Every structure is written in C-alpha cells, then in structure tokens.
C-alpha cells in the first residue's frame, strides 16, 4: 500500500511476492518485476501476471539460486512469454552483449551500480568491496536460512560457526526490525506465515528471516562492516573504480555495441 500511495511506477522484488500482492499492484497500475532464480519460479510468477522477470544466476549477490546465469537465462526464455532481464555477474558491456546473444532483453546490475560515485553506500563499505577478489565471496545459509552470496567476512564466519546462538540473534533482530518499521507483532507473524507458504520455507528459515535486513542495514546504511553483511555478486572482483552512473551506463552501451559489431563482422 505504501508503494501505491507513493505512486511508485515499478516494483521489483528480491524474492517473489504473494499472488495477492501482485494482483493489488497490477490493479493500481504498477509494473511488477520480481527476481527469480529457477525456471519453476518464473513459470509461477508468469501465471500471476507479472510484467517481466529478472532471472538471476548463482553468480549474483544476496539471495541466489544454484543455476549459473548462462544456463538459467535460456531455461527461463523457453519457459515464459515475458521480457527477461538477465542478472548475476554482469559488470560491463561485454556481459550485456552476451545476455542479448542468449535472448535476454537486457541486464540488471546490483554490485556494479553499488560501486559508483553516486551510490549512497558509505565510503568505507565501498572500500571493502573494491578490495574483494572474485574468489572472496561465499554462499551461506547462516544469515536467514536461505542461500545468500556475500563477501566472506569475519562476521559471516562467526554466523556460520555460532549455530547455537543463531535463533536468539534472529529474535533480537526481529524486534529491532519491528521497531524500525513500525510493524506490529501480529503483522510480523502474518508475514512469516505468508513467506513460509509462498516460498516453501521451513519454520527455521522463517524464524531467521529478520536477520538479513538488519545485518544489511548495519553495513549499507550505518557503515558498520564489522557487525553486518556485504551482499555481493562474483563480478565484484572485476571492479576497481567508482565512476558516475552516467559514465558507467554510457561506457557499457559503447562496449556492448563494439562487441556486437565484432560478432556481426563489423
């Protein structure tokens, strides 16, 4: 309802929303583009009437699946009659050209846009990203029970080792999330039940769900890298500078055009 009241034109979701949420947004004229990581998920949201899908391969940051981008995109294109935006490991125009060659309609980039001069992420956090090689990421379920690709920091290693304290930590984060958002306890419980049904989660995964937003906020908003997580795609190791968004987009278009011309013998 906040999105509708604010007259947001496009709603993108890191994980698929409920069918009722899609219907409500579509009724209000909002373009709905969820992110999916498997063919079956694309088929499900297509039945719900979404406008397009972002298909993210395992190279992508944050919540991610197990299928590489180069395999996932053709699978999704064969499964749905929707615009398909490729994601997971894209940082330059060569990647855009590759995605277009697979049949995708474009690319989505998270880590690459995060590492720009225009990004509001704290400078010390950007420095952590720039110092990370492609081999410096890990996929872990220790944060909220679902696989997430993050930078392999000491904090992540502590989360993976501290299985006995995982649920008390999640409960504390749930209370902080409730205070931050003004959400009632009843609403949190209802959302947990909805998540379990919509995403086929275990109750353990539902209990851990508040961890991700609070640990991400600690780094991305507060700059506290020692107590938060750093979601990132594997493309992070190919990034070594912070251009403006305008310069980055122009460069990517030029690189993609050059690559496609070369493929066409131009």
Where does each model-flagged region fall?
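Conserved active-site-proximal phosphate/metal-binding subdomains
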Residues: 69-81, 91-266
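Alpha/beta enzyme core
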Residues: 1-85, 92-111, 182-186, 191
């Amino acid at each position: 309802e906040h999105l509708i009241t604010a007259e947001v034109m496009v709603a993108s979701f890191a994980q698929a929303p409920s069918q009722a949420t899609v219907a409500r947004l579509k009724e209000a004229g909002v373009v709905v583009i969820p992110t999916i990581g498997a063919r079956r998920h694309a088929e499900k949201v297509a039945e719900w009437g979404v406008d397009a899908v972002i298909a993210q391969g395992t190279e992508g940051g944050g919540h991610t699946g197990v299928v590489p981008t180069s395999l996932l995109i053709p699978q999704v294109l064969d499964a749905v009659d929707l615009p398909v935006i490729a994601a997971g490991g894209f940082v330059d125009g060569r990647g855009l050209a590759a995605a277009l060659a697979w049949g995708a309609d474009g690319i989505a980039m998270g880590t690459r846009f995060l590492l720009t001069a225009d990004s509001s992420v704290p400078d010390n956090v950007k420095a952590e990203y720039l110092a990370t090689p492609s081999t410096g990421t890990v996929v872990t379920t220790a944060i909220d029970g679902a696989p997430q690709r993050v930078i392999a920091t000491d904090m992540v290693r502590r989360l993976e080792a501290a299985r006995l304290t995982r649920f008390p930590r999640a409960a504390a984060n749930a209370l902080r999330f409730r205070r931050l958002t003004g959400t009632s306890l009843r609403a949190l419980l209802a959302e947990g039940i909805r998540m379990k049904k919509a995403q086929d989660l275990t109750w353990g995964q539902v209990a851990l769900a508040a961890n991700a937003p609070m640990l991400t906020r600690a780094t991305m908003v507060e700059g506290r890298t020692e107590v938060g997580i750093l979601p990132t795609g594997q493309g992070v190791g190919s990034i070594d500078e912070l251009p403006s968004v305008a310069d980055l987009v122009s460069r990517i278009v030029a690189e993609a055009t050059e690559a496609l011309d070369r493929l066409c013998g131009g």
